Design a protein with these regions (language model features):
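Acidic/histidine-rich catalytic cores and adjacent linkers
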Residues: 43, 124, 232-245, 285-520
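Short, charged amphipathic recognition helices of the HTH superfamily
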Residues: 106-122
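RNase H-like nuclease fold core
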Residues: 24, 70, 77-100, 111-112, ...
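RNase H-like two-metal-ion nuclease catalytic core shared by retroviral integrases
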Residues: 258-284, 429-440
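Heptad-repeat coiled-coil/leucine-zipper oligomerization helices
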Residues: 7, 11-14, 18-28, 32-70
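A generic secondary-structure signal
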Residues: 28, 32, 60, 117-121, ...
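N-terminal membrane insertion elements
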Residues: 1-7
């Protein structure tokens, strides 16, 4: 293989050229390094800016998250303000939404309190809304109540009436009748609610004999049809007239409230014994002895004269509590109370240990029976199921005695007799607790007026048995005007005790003013 003919001298350079080349290379590297350094500094600056932007974005995001709940709260308030200020109902200065809100609030807290609460809310939120006065709110409630007194049932429906009368000051009583179609009863396992019921009649009166109640039953039956069933307490003036009612050839079946019946059984069983009377006497003395002492935590509940055996559970529970702490000297509740003081004021309860066990067991059976009826209703087979329920309760009671067994049998026998009155396949109710609840709601609304006899506020009673919505308000207030309300009050309530008192004082003031002018 031939070698190349190129000479080595052709690739040799002078030292000068080599140095110059190296210097040029160094300068180029330095310039490149400077450019890279400038790029690095620029990138660092950009990175710092991006970090600052990221930090600012994070802070803004945190601010948004912090303010979001307030924005969420303000948005509905803006919507509420819009709805409360929407178009007014014809003849009114307020919207249906505002009126419905006022009525619902008044049902819970009262008329004056509703006005005060709304004013505080509107001012706190800065809403540009005018709040109605308590008198206006009362007028709305009363008009809505009168409009609800209508026939809510179809001709072909089987209906259950519940009737009772409530006393007020003097001889005044009001007969209240509410109703529900059997097909609208709650499903087994559920309880009746006020909104399930319809107020059918509100009739004040000074006396309620059989003929008086019968007259009102007949008037209501002529208006909306007779009920298939009527449920009330054991008062003959309520029960006997109902037996004369009839619809489609079928007589109205009269049922007795389980709670009233159970209270009567309990009274006959223990209430007439000297032992129980002595116990009540000791309770009254104990109340006076401990209520202003360090034992005030053990003050017994006040004794009720009326319906005492319908409200005995609270008293028996107190007796159990006080008896328990007699033997718990180290408990926190007993701090500062010596054994000597406990025994001096409450030691007498030890003498009634066995009695309290028996009485409490009877009350527990009543509670279980009421719980069963209030969730299942009355039907064929109810008594058998109730017996099983009571057997379960008795498993956890101390040793049963004759009185406890008697109470169990009395409850089951009563339900057996009641279910035998039903038609095959029908299910009704055997508790008027919903009616008592309605009376309670009304008296709470009535508040200070309850000491002045029944007033025009009776017109508002039906509002507790309806779901008050803007749509309902829009419809009902167009049906009943203030003039219609005044006519209803004049016809139904008439001159009230409050109005008679006002007139008496007015005449007295005029007479006194006349005497003063003559003297001058």
């Amino acid at each position: 293989m031939a070698l190349s003919g190129t000479r080595p001298s052709q690739y040799k350079s002078s030292h000068y050229e080599v140095k110059r080349s190296l210097i040029r290379s160094r300068d180029r590297q330095r310039q490149r390094a400077e450019r890279l350094q400038q790029q690095v500094e620029a990138l660092k600056a950009e990175n710092q800016r991006l970090r600052q932007d990221l930090q600012q974005a994070a802070e803004e995001l945190e601010m948004v998250r912090t303010l979001q709940p307030f924005e969420d709260a303000v948005s509905p308030l803006d919507s509420l303000a819009t709805r409360l200020s929407e178009f007014h109902i014809a003849g009114h200065h307020y919207s249906a939404t505002m009126i419905a809100l006022c009525i619902n609030l008044a049902r819970d807290v009262g008329f004056r309190q509703a006005e005060t609460s709304l004013k505080a809310l509107v001012e706190a939120l800065g809403l540009p809304i005018k709040v109605p006065s308590h008198d206006v709110i009362r007028n709305w409630c009363s008009r809505l109540g009168v409009s609800e007194l209508r026939n809510p049932f179809r001709e072909d429906q089987d209906v259950l009436w519940m009737a009772d009368h409530s006393s007020q000051i003097g001889k005044e009583k009001v007969l209240l009748i509410i109703g529900i179609a059997l097909e609208d009863l709650p499903q087994p396992g559920e309880t009746l609610a006020l909104e399930d019921m319809h107020v059918l009649a509100i009739i004040p009166g000074k006396q309620w004999k059989k003929e008086d109640v019968g007259r009102e039953y007949q008037k209501l039956a002529a208006k909306i049809g007779a009920p298939r069933y009527l449920l009330c307490d054991g008062a003959t003036e309520l029960q006997d007239p109902a037996k004369e009612l009839e619809k489609n050839g079928k007589k109205t079946v009269v049922l007795t409230d389980l709670k009233h019946h159970a209270a009567n059984v309990l009274e006959k069983l223990i209430g007439r014994s000297e032992r129980f009377k002595t116990f009540l006497s000791e309770v009254g003395l104990t109340r006076n002895r401990v209520q202003q002492t360090e034992l005030s935590v053990f003050v017994p509940p006040p004794l009720k004269v009326k319906s005492r055996f319908m409200n005995l559970a609270g008293l028996l529970r107190w007796a159990g509590l006080a008896s328990y702490y007699l033997d718990q000297p180290q408990s926190e509740i007993r701090a500062g109370i010596s054994d000597e003081r406990m025994n001096e004021k409450l030691g007498w309860l030890r003498e009634y240990g066995e009695d309290l066990i028996c009485w409490t067991a009877c009350q527990l059976l009543i509670n279980a029976a009421l719980r069963f009826i209030n969730h299942q209703g009355l039907f064929h087979g109810a008594a058998a199921q109730l017996r099983q329920e009571l057997a379960q309760v008795m498993r956890y009671l101390p040793k049963a005695n004759e009185a406890v067994n008697f109470m169990r049998d009395a409850l089951v026998d009563f339900v057996t007799q009641s279910e035998q009155k039903l038609e095959a396949g029908q299910r009704v109710w055997l508790s008027t607790e919903i009616l008592e609840s309605l009376f309670g709601q009304y008296k709470r609304l009535e508040s200070q007026h309850s000491k002045g006899g029944f007033t025009s506020l009776l017109a508002a009673l039906p509002i507790f048995c309806c779901r008050v919505t803007p749509a309902l308000v829009q419809r009902r207030l167009q049906e009943v005007s203030t003039t219609d309300l005044n006519e209803w009050v004049q016809t139904t309530v008439g001159p009230t005790l409050t109005s008679r008192r006002t007139r008496a004082y007015r005449e007295y003031d005029r007479a006194m003013a006349g005497q003063v002018s003559q003297a001058i």
